[in-house]
């Protein structure tokens, strides 16, 4: 089983044209529909649109990836709808706790685009609603005042950070999603792929304790010198708020957070943040980032009638009307989306050749091992090679237990 995101998804988003808006909700929902998803702006928009149908209970939680496996394994499932991404869909698919959607798409998904249909082994298992990637965001006013060009490489990021630090214009030159666990692992995945590193050997044994792995960790540590010293608690919301409060000058942050920079209700830097491609590293040509999709799945452990009802509610949440009301909240794959300046960084990252996140069962195990093991290097407890060796050992144990190796 493989979960794949093609850069064609970004091309598809670029080519979408406006369509006619539908009514607020095409039917009156009389059954309770529960959803569990992340809590960023796009999910707020989608779940608010679903709620217009009535009887919708939406749980928005950035720890959704930890809760979903057990919640969807319950019988009946604790939720009808799940919000997922490339990697977070994998454990649900492997466990058989979400259902194929082919029949429901045929009956109620006429508005969906071909590039929204996420197929696993020929079956539609998820509906993609948006694409996402981490890319460079920077304070255009500070960069202009200091004569700094938009950094295209991580070496240029370090040089820019040093100049900004010397100028003393912000609390910290750089922000980073380095929170221990999933976020920190994703930072390594991005950087390691920028070094063109391979995660596994042919037999799915680990392959990260090498020159590329050490170099990736060393670059990550070099960047932390310009971050808030509490970077190991810094997730996407933390970095977003650092930007909005004028505390940092740049970060490689998720495209789904771009619109928040210009939200006048909570941001002090409206119009001052520019979005560009994720940097390359060490002379490479591929951005040190990964491409993602976010979308919707339907629980397996509910009745067919409840599944159909939940799917209808979900379709109301990702329709053209929702996009027209929330165009800037994401790089939508939905009919009616019109790309804006806040999408520029995501499109540039894709156009420059960023690769899809390599979602798979073994990668889920590797991601967990990375998230648990990298901090020991950053804090000085272990050398880079020792940390990578321990991560490989942790992955090997988990992979053998899971039958991957």
Residue ranges of predicted features:
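A structural signal for short loop-to-beta-strand junctions that line the ligand-binding cleft
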Residues: 70, 78-80, 108-143, 172, ...
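Conserved N-terminal structural module of periplasmic/extracytoplasmic solute-binding proteins
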Residues: 6-9, 21-88, 232, 284, ...
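Glycine-centered hinge/linker elements that transmit conformational signals in sensory
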Residues: 161, 204-232
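C-terminal capping/gating helix-and-loop segments adjacent to ligand/active sites or protein-protein/ligand interfaces
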Residues: 57, 119, 344-398
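Hinge/lid segment of periplasmic solute-binding proteins
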Residues: 85-133, 158, 187, 272-276
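Short, solvent-exposed loop/beta-turn-alpha elements that line the ligand-binding surface or hinge
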Residues: 99-115, 173-179, 195-216, 264-268, ...
């Amino acid at each position: 089983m493989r979960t794949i995101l093609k850069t064609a998804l970004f091309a598809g988003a670029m080519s979408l044209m406006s369509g006619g808006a539908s009514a607020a909700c095409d039917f009156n929902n009389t059954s309770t529909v529960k959803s569990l998803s992340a809590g960023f702006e796009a999910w707020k928009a989608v779940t608010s649109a679903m709620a217009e149908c009535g009887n919708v209970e939406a749980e928005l939680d950035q720890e959704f990836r930890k809760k979903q496996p057990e919640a969807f394994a319950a019988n009946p499932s604790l939720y009808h709808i799940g919000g997922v991404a490339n990697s977070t869909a994998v454990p649900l698919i492997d466990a058989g706790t979400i259902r194929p959607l082919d029949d429901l798409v045929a009956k109620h998904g006429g508005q969906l685009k071909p590039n929204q249909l996420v197929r696993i082994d020929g079956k539609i298992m998820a509906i993609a609603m948006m694409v996402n990637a981490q890319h460079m965001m920077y304070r255009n006013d500070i960069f202009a005042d200091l004569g700094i060009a938009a950094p295209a490489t991580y070496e240029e990021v370090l040089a820019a950070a040093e100049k900004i630090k010397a100028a003393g214009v912000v609390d910290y030159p750089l922000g980073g999603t380095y929170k221990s666990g999933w976020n920190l692992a994703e930072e390594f995945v991005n950087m390691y792929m920028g070094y063109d590193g391979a995660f596994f050997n042919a037999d799915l044994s680990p392959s990260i304790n090498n020159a590329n792995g050490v170099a990736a960790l060393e670059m990550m540590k070099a960047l932390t010198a310009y971050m808030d010293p509490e970077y190991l608690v810094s997730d996407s919301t933390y970095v977003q708020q650092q930007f909005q409060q004028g505390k940092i000058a740049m970060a490689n942050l998720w495209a789904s957070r771009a619109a928040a920079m210009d939200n006048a209700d909570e941001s002090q830097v409206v119009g001052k943040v520019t979005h560009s491609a994720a940097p390359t590293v060490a002379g490479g040509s591929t951005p040190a980032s990964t491409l993602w999709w976010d979308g919707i799945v339907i629980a397996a452990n509910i009745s067919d009638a409840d599944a159909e009802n939940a799917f209808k509610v979900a379709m109301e949440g990702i329709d053209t009307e929702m996009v027209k009301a929330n165009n800037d909240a994401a790089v939508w794959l939905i009919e009616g989306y019109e790309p804006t300046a806040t999408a520029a960084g995501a499109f540039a990252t894709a156009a420059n050749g960023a690769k899809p996140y390599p979602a798979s069962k073994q990668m889920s195990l590797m991601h967990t091992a990375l998230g648990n093991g990298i901090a020991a290097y950053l804090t000085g407890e272990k050398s880079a090679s020792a940390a990578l060796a321990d991560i490989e050992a942790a992955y090997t144990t988990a992979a053998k237990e899971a039958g991957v190796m």
